[in-house]
A protein has these predicted regions:
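Nucleotidyltransferase catalytic core that binds NTPs
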Residues: 2-228, 236-240, 268, 274, ...
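Acidic/histidine-rich
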Residues: 220-263
Length: 291
């Protein structure tokens, strides 16, 4: 495995078809699943590790984001990553950027309205990675459903020749969606309220419920009763990420809540017939240390 911090060296290390896994480090099984997914169609798997300052609204959140360099390298090598690209802020942004990628519409609700500028930072860094590394494919997890919609729209609008590989949410054995921020969770019962609410809503949809309001209410009330401070529960169109009143198209039910000092997000992805992708569960404890 080759580790480099410059675009030039990373490109020199790559050969054949390239699959990219963009990350901010502190790897977990969700990131590793993304690497496995692009490996199936790629000669070379590149994983970027870069904590992108442009997507943080709060400087203290940026400073607090967990980091684990040696552990990340060991995990990347274990799953067969060929190149780790870990640039400095100066490599990614030689000067304070005057140009940003803004994907309107799809960023207006949910996380976009709560975290102004967040998705501009995400789209900008991903566009730079695509331009600098020129991958043939890139893997993104369905756990960040709105982010996935943003990236797919950016790729379509700007004509990047990159195939986006969607990877199902990876969950701990008790259902908690994996996130690097899970290490900060102190009240696990409250945190589990998010996934349990989503699963109950998915059960209801599977039984025929199509009302967005009712599905949102099931998810939100369940999480609240568990002790989570719910920010929103919204049924959204999978492509536009706009809120919809009825489950009658590909969609996702997203929830965001605060558990203590940690803000968590989760979702389930729906087909129009009410069937749901709830993600995959680990058989045992996560490498992050959870259940």
């Amino acid at each position: 495995m080759i580790v480099t911090d410059t675009f030039v060296a990373a490109r020199r290390a790559m050969s054949g078809t390239v699959g990219l896994v963009p990350t901010m480090g502190y790897l977990h099984e969700g990131h590793l699943a993304c690497a496995t997914a692009v490996r199936a169609t790629s000669d070379c798997v590149v994983m970027s590790i870069f904590v992108n300052p442009l997507q943080f609204n709060d400087p203290s959140d940026l400073a607090r984001y967990p980091r684990s360099w040696d552990r990340d390298l060991a995990l990347a090598e274990r799953v067969g990553v060929d190149v780790v690209f870990a640039p400095s802020v100066e490599e990614m942004y030689p000067e304070p950027p005057l140009t940003r990628v803004i994907v309107s519409g799809v960023t207006e609700g949910m996380e976009g309205s709560r975290r102004p500028g967040h998705f501009d930072g995400v789209a900008t860094v991903v566009a730079k990675l695509f331009a600098g590394l020129r991958p043939d494919s890139a893997a993104f997890g369905r756990k960040d459903a709105q982010q996935l919609a943003v990236i797919k729209r950016m790729v379509s609008d700007l004509g990047f020749p990159v195939t986006i590989v969607e990877v199902p949410t990876v969950r701990e054995s008790d259902g908690l969606a994996l996130s690097s921020r899970n290490v900060f969770i102190e009240d696990r019962r409250a945190a589990l309220g998010l996934s349990r609410g989503l699963f109950l809503a998915a059960d209801s949809a599977g039984a025929g419920e199509r009302s967005g309001r009712i599905l949102e209410d099931i998810a939100g009330r369940t999480a609240s009763r568990a002790g989570a401070l719910v920010d929103y529960a919204e049924l959204a169109d999978a492509r536009s990420a706009r809120r919809i009143p009825t489950l009658d198209r590909p969609a996702f039910l997203a929830i965001a809540a605060r558990v203590g000092a940690v803000r968590l997000i989760d979702n389930v992805v729906f087909e129009p017939d009410g069937s749901a992708d709830r993600g995959t569960r680990l058989d045992g404890p996560s490498i992050l240390g959870g259940s």
